[in-house]
Swiss-Prot record:
<dbReference type="InterPro" id="IPR015928">
    <property type="entry name" value="Aconitase/3IPM_dehydase_swvl"/>
</dbReference>
<protein>
    <recommendedName>
        <fullName>3-isopropylmalate dehydratase small subunit</fullName>
        <ecNumber>4.2.1.33</ecNumber>
    </recommendedName>
</protein>
<keyword id="KW-0100">Branched-chain amino acid biosynthesis</keyword>
<dbReference type="InterPro" id="IPR004431">
    <property type="entry name" value="3-IsopropMal_deHydase_ssu"/>
</dbReference>
<dbReference type="GO" id="GO:0009316">
    <property type="term" value="C:3-isopropylmalate dehydratase complex"/>
</dbReference>
<keyword id="KW-0456">Lyase</keyword>
<dbReference type="Pfam" id="PF00694">
    <property type="entry name" value="Aconitase_C"/>
</dbReference>
<dbReference type="InterPro" id="IPR050075">
    <property type="entry name" value="LeuD"/>
</dbReference>
<keyword id="KW-0028">Amino-acid biosynthesis</keyword>
<comment type="pathway">
    <text>Amino-acid biosynthesis; L-leucine biosynthesis; L-leucine from 3-methyl-2-oxobutanoate: step 2/4.</text>
</comment>
<dbReference type="InterPro" id="IPR000573">
    <property type="entry name" value="AconitaseA/IPMdHydase_ssu_swvl"/>
</dbReference>
<comment type="subunit">
    <text>Heterodimer of LeuC and LeuD.</text>
</comment>
<dbReference type="InterPro" id="IPR033940">
    <property type="entry name" value="IPMI_Swivel"/>
</dbReference>
<comment type="similarity">
    <text>Belongs to the LeuD family. LeuD type 1 subfamily.</text>
</comment>
<comment type="function">
    <text>Catalyzes the isomerization between 2-isopropylmalate and 3-isopropylmalate, via the formation of 2-isopropylmaleate.</text>
</comment>
<dbReference type="GO" id="GO:0003861">
    <property type="term" value="F:3-isopropylmalate dehydratase activity"/>
</dbReference>
<dbReference type="GO" id="GO:0009098">
    <property type="term" value="P:L-leucine biosynthetic process"/>
</dbReference>
């Protein structure tokens, strides 16, 4: 997983609330457990509409999504996070997220920041007026759009994991020496994991 400290890209105003994981990526795209091959399925039911925001310049190159409240609700679908990340999104901001979606995002390297709805609405207006350059500073917990800075919330543990670039495997590998030392002292008759 890549470290996330700061990111500058195009902000995308998604003026939709109650976006569930089936809207993010419909079930017909969930035929793989690999983390790739899902970008085409992202918002596919909406992308058939030529007026959908991701079909518009410069938003089709967006990497920071500002969504309405209740983003990522519905089933626990890691594919939704993978689709957003593979499309190019590095961060998603909303005034409310589904807890499971938010947890899946942090583990996969996608920043999900909580913001006041009033700030989201101000950002939507800025983005729609052409001020699309957006900088996310995870260390400072700020988003800057068109010279205006806004704060966002993220729990300390997820923030640390993102800044260190640690997924679950990376966390385990940080303790590889301790694990090997423990395994070397286990009696031979006890079960052990054997490398393939």
């Amino acid at each position: 997983m890549e470290k996330f400290v700061t990111h500058t890209g195009v902000g995308v105003p998604l003026r939709v609330s109650n976006v569930d994981t089936d809207q993010i990526i419909p079930a017909r795209y969930l035929k793989s457990v690999k983390r790739t091959g899902f970008a085409d399925g992202l918002f596919s039911n909406w992308r058939s509409d030529e007026n959908f925001i991701l079909n518009q310049e410069p938003f089709k190159e967006g990497s920071v999504l500002f969504a309405g409240p209740d983003f990522g609700t519905g089933s626990s679908r890691e594919h939704a996070v993978w689709a957003l990340a593979e499309y190019g999104f590095k961060a998603v901001f909303s005034s409310r997220f589904a807890d499971i979606f938010r947890g899946n995002s942090g583990k996969a390297g996608l920043l999900t920041g909580l913001m006041e709805q009033e700030d989201i609405e101000l950002i939507w207006k800025q983005l729609e007026s052409g001020e699309t350059e957006t900088t996310v500073d995870l260390e400072a917990r700020t988003v800057t759009v068109g010279g205006n800075s806004y704060t966002f919330e993220i729990d300390d543990y997820t923030r640390w994991r993102l800044m260190e670039g640690l997924d679950d495997i990376g966390l385990t590998l940080r303790n590889e020496g301790d694990i090997e030392a423990f395994e070397s002292t286990r009696p031979g008759f006890k079960p052990r994991v054997v490398a393939s």
